[in-house]
Amino acid sequence: MFTPPTDPKKSVKVKVSQLCELCHARKAVMKRPKNLQRICKECFFSVFETEIHNTIVSNNLFHRGERIAVGASGGKDSTVLAYVLKLLNDRHDYGVEIVLLSIDEGIVGYRDDSLATVKRNQVQYDLPLEIVSYKDLYNWTMDEIVACAGIRNSCTYCGVFRRQALDRGAAKLGIKHVVTGHNADDMAETVLMNILRGDVARLEKSTSILTQSSGSPIKRSKPFKYSYQKEIVLYAHYKKLDYFSTECSYAPEAFRGTARELMKNLEAIRPSCIIDIIHSGESLKLKPKRAKKAPPPSHMEIRPDGSVSLQNEFIDGNRCERCGYLSSNKICKACMLLEGLEQNRAKIQLEKDSTTEGAAKLSRTLEKLQF
């Protein structure tokens, strides 16, 4: 239960209409986006932290002795997440070990600066940090990918590679739980995106606070599921937290922006629409699919490491034949994208060579001409 913090200092006379609606003692400095409640800074800190604690406890997200990796990008969400989790872990004795896990996508002028923020957070919060790069995992950076495949599909590549990179980074650390800073706005946007795209398969699980791929030992949780983005920004501002606020240079091309604009228009009319959309997503249930017949045992091959290779069908826990990552197909999505990139790079190089050869031939022809 939330209890308004007491102020040891002598109260100052303030108009009743300007008083905090919770403690009725201090001046209100903000209006909460989700319920338009006017509250003071101290009460905001308490209610914000209490709501996140209640979300963690009610969903049984953490277990004593567990090691968790916080996906740290240096942005407002992950910075506040790391700060609040450390605070609540100390205050309520969750008994978990927190590690910062960052992904370096290789975006010059964006990720290099944000990683500098993460490194400062590591010192400020006294937490261990692990950085995993696209270049080390895939031998590509996002800048190289965009130069090769164009900017329009950049978020598709980055989304697939980033999810796999987080899992690989966690596995490297021996951690089976990754915590991300997805907030209520992100969750509502995802619901709208899946509706607009007609993506029924993802719609049902788009509001899950705890997810885990079939056969994967690594689970993911979102303690900020019910926390509004505006409140996260205000918390970071009032707490004077060190975070990186520049948007990714490739983000404007993302389809998510369409859902975000739609939601902003809805929120202007109905402030509670973000939570309403999440609750609607939670209520959605798809009709159960007909169970598929299991493939004959002769189609299975057990590898020395215990993973399963199938010729035709898929069994939960199967691994990509190229990289060993969990996949519902013989070749995982990341490897398929990498194959397309390599083919495109070879094509681009061939075109460059042809252009160079053509220019050289034209130059030799001109040299032979006599005027």
Curated annotation (Swiss-Prot):
Its EC number is 2.7.7.-. GO terms for molecular function: nucleotidyltransferase activity; tRNA binding. One of its GO terms (biological process) is protein urmylation. It comes from the Eukaryota. SUPFAM superfamilies: Adenine nucleotide alpha hydrolases-like. It is an enzyme of class 2 (transferase). This is Cytoplasmic tRNA 2-thiolation protein 1. The lineage of its organism: Eukaryota, Fungi, Dikarya, Ascomycota, Saccharomycotina.
